[in-house]
Amino acid sequence: MARLTRLLPLAALVLSACSITPPKGPGKSPDAPQWRQHQQEVRNLSQYQTRGAFAYLSDQQKVYARFFWQQTGQDRYRLLLLNPLGSTELELKAQPGEAQITDNKGQQYTGTDAEEMIGKLTGMPIPINSLRQWILGLPGDATDYKLDDQYRLSQMNYSQNGKTWKVIYGGYDSATKPALPSSMELTEGGQRIKLKMDNWIVK
């Protein structure tokens, strides 16, 4: 599979080199009932989709793309990475126990671990298994996190397999109920992943 460095337009100015900074001021307690209620409302979402801009930045490669994320059921989701012309560079379909990736040449790969497959095929170690929760503003398995003044996830640290990811949320889309993230940044060592969500559709 040709690595996704072809996706690299400098047109992705929406994801500039500047970093997201967490909101200033005191956050709310993770023990607050408002936070528990928000988490439950998000978990109750059975289907949702979002699209936006994606960037992966490291010393080895810089990748910019459009993305489309669709959750169709419990542990069933689809991820598309698109080039600036709108053509699909990578499609991931996942369901319990099975993941399938199709590259830009139509070659298909199947396996059981979507995260491992994406890392091997693209050279981008995206923590997709955790990102499924993080993109919704849920901590997943992370226990080291902070809330903003609206009882929503503000930032967190998550360590697994010798890596520690730091996640910072740049804002939330209050037009959706419950409010869902509008931008986020993940950093680990010398690599950075940035996501900017244009909009959300929830059911």
Swiss-Prot record:
Task: Classify the protein's membrane topology as the record does.
Answer: Lipid-anchor
Where is it predominantly found?
membrane
Which GO biological process annotations does it have? Answer: lipoprotein localization to outer membrane; protein transport
> Which SUPFAM superfamilies does the UniProt entry name for this protein?
Prokaryotic lipoproteins and lipoprotein localization factors
Q: Which residue(s) hold a covalent lipid per the annotation (S-diacylglycerol cysteine)? A: C18
List GO terms (cellular component aspect): cell outer membrane
N-terminal signal peptide: 1-17
Cell compartment(s), UniProt: Cell outer membrane
Lipid-acceptor residues (N-palmitoyl cysteine): C18
Among InterPro entries, the record links this protein to: LolA/LolB/LppX, OM_lipoprot_LolB
| Keywords of this entry | Cell outer membrane, Chaperone, Lipoprotein, Membrane, Palmitate, Protein transport, Signal, Transport
Protein family membership: Belongs to the LolB family.
The annotated subunit structure for this chain is:
Monomer.
Q: Which NCBIfam families match?
A: lolB
Its biological purpose is as follows: Plays a critical role in the incorporation of lipoproteins in the outer membrane after they are released by the LolA protein.
Question: What name appears for this protein in its UniProt entry?
Answer: Outer-membrane lipoprotein LolB
Q: Which gene encodes it?
A: lolB
